């Protein structure tokens, strides 16, 4: 997946250099389709952060496309790779005694709609120098929480550290706001912040309130990663009755903050493709000449 995103970024970076020999006046016909690349930070909200706070800032990278339906409304699609991390050692209350931690590499694909505060202008190059927008949509998330033990990294979901199964593919609802800054007729900079509501409490592999009975867990690795209090001598004599592991009443979520470069694609790209496609179709359906 990382290689796919890198290849996509290289392709997007090359687009502005295609057809640069033509003047602006030759290309000023309206453009409604944009491509983008961006980067920023991601942070998560769940059991391994202080109440009302977010976790450590981790990097993300995104590619996307956007189409303007009219001067205010647009539809967009984005593919984002990001990391999340949580650690009880950073807790400012008694949760440090739980001694749990996780890190994960995640992939999100989302389809969203955006609305601008002010119209973009009759032509794309007549848009205002600064505009504010809001967006919302729906997406799908792949996440894979992992933890280290004795110098090795283990994926937690297959181990079922709480004795429960859950899917690593979940729907998400992204919502957020942003600002669009015009660099020149063809380029924008977006500064955006968006929160993702999820339908799972397992981004960090922690959910149930009480520790599970060790006898129901798969193996010794699962048992050790399920209850890590013995590593710092905080384990009670009866772990299934004493101590809180998670909070199943609240779902996990994450926040993405990005700076994105957008480029308006010329219509000639699509027109040339249509001409080539139609030419091939005509050649395919052309009847053979009689001898």
Model-inferred region functions:
Residues 37-39, 63-67, 111-115, 136-140, ...:
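Residues on the lipid-exposed face of transmembrane beta-strands in outer-membrane beta-barrel proteins
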């Amino acid at each position: 997946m990382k290689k796919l995103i890198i290849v996509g970024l290289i392709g997007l970076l090359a687009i502005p250099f295609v057809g640069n020999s033509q003047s602006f006046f030759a290309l000023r016909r309206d453009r409604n389709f944009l491509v983008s690349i961006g980067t920023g930070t991601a942070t998560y909200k769940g059991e391994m952060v202080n109440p009302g706070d977010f976790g450590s800032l981790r990097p993300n990278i995104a590619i996307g496309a956007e189409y303007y339906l009219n001067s205010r409304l647009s539809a967009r699609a984005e593919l984002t790779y990001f990391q999340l991390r949580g650690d009880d050692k950073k807790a400012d209350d008694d949760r440090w005694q739980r001694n749990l931690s996780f890190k994960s590499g995640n992939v999100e694909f989302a389809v969203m709609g955006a609305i601008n505060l002010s119209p973009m202008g009759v032509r794309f190059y007549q848009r205002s120098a600064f505009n504010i927008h809001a967006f919302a949509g729906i997406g799908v998330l792949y996440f894979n929480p992992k933890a280290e033990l004795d110098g090795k990294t283990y994926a937690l979901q297959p181990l079922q550290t709480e004795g429960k199964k859950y899917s690593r593919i979940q729907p998400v609802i992204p919502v957020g706001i942003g600002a669009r800054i015009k660099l020149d007729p063809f380029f924008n900079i977006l500064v955006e912040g968006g929160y993702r509501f999820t339908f799972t409490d397992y981004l960090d592999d922690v959910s149930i309130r009480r520790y599970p009975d060790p006898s129901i867990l798969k193996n010794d690795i699962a048992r050790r990663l399920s209850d890590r209090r013995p590593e710092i001598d905080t384990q009670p004599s009866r772990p299934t009755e004493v101590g809180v592991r998670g909070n199943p009443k609240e779902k996990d979520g994450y926040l993405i903050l990005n700076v994105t470069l957008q480029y308006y694609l010329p219509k000639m790209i699509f027109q040339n493709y249509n001409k080539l496609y139609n030419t091939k179709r005509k050649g395919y359906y052309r009847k053979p000449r009689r001898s």
